[in-house]
Amino acid sequence: MMQDVSSSPVSPADDSLSNSEEEPDRQQPPSGKRGGRKRRSSRRSAGGGAGPGGAAGGVGGGDEPGSPAQGKRGKKSAGCGGGAGGGGSSSGGGSPQSYEELQTQRVMANVRERQRTQSLNEAFAALRKIIPTLPSDKLSKIQTLKLAARYIDFLYQVLQSDELDSKMASCSYVAHERLSYAFSVWRMEGAWSMSASH
């Protein structure tokens, strides 16, 4: 009789233990067998140190038997935000430095571009002062360059011709005025209109 009594309390305890062991197994199917694999990998990573198993173990550790929905959320967050966070931690804070370096490079490139365009505009303004222009001229940069090339050609032709003598060359102001007038007349005759149309 004592054996029966002693065996009867043990058997319910064994049943309760077996039930308690079976209950997590029944509750784990929503998370699947992956949770068990991740737990095994987490044990391996805990014994072996850091590695890819450690990241999987961290996700597996979040899968509690009573909260399968939290496990799915943990997987989503690990897949989306965890990847970016892992990249930042693996680079050791290198990504903010690279972003700052990119920003400084962009700022320096913008400064250089502004300086280049400013110096280019100043050079074109000086060139427009030298080239005789008509009051109706609103020249673009390419038209200014074409007009400068025409003016150089015109000056070369004037120097080669015998129309201007040394008296005109003695006074630069008069020579410049006459050259400007002659160049304007030369432009009005159609020599510039053909090149400006292109």
Swiss-Prot record:
Which stretches does the entry tag as region Disordered? 1-101
Q: Where in the cell is it found?
A: Nucleus
**Ranges of Gly residues compositional bias?**
46-64, 79-95
Determine if DNA-binding is one of this entry's keywords: yes
Q: Name one Pfam family in it.
A: HLH
Q: Which GO molecular function terms does the record list?
A: DNA-binding transcription factor activity, RNA polymerase II-specific; protein dimerization activity; RNA polymerase II transcription regulatory region sequence-specific DNA binding
Which keywords does this chain's UniProt record carry? Activator, Biological rhythms, Developmental protein, Differentiation, DNA-binding, Myogenesis, Nucleus, Repressor, Transcription, Transcription regulation
Q: Which GO terms describe its cellular component?
A: nucleus
Q: Which domain of life is it from?
A: Eukaryota
Q: Where is this region: Sufficient for transactivation activity?
A: 157-187
Q: Which PANTHER family match?
A: BASIC HELIX-LOOP-HELIX TRANSCRIPTION FACTOR, TWIST (PTHR23349), TWIST-RELATED PROTEIN 1 (PTHR23349:SF64)
- What assembly does the database describe for this protein? Efficient DNA binding requires dimerization with another bHLH protein. Homodimer or heterodimer with E proteins such as TCF3. ID1 binds preferentially to TCF3 but does not interact efficiently with TWIST1 so ID1 levels control the amount of TCF3 available to dimerize with TWIST and thus determine the type of dimer formed.
User: Main role?
Assistant: Acts as a transcriptional regulator. Inhibits myogenesis by sequestrating E proteins, inhibiting trans-activation by MEF2, and inhibiting DNA-binding by MYOD1 through physical interaction. This interaction probably involves the basic domains of both proteins. Also represses expression of pro-inflammatory cytokines such as TNFA and IL1B. Regulates cranial suture patterning and fusion. Activates transcription as a heterodimer with E proteins. Regulates gene expression differentially, depending on dimer composition.
This protein is called what? Answer: Twist-related protein 1
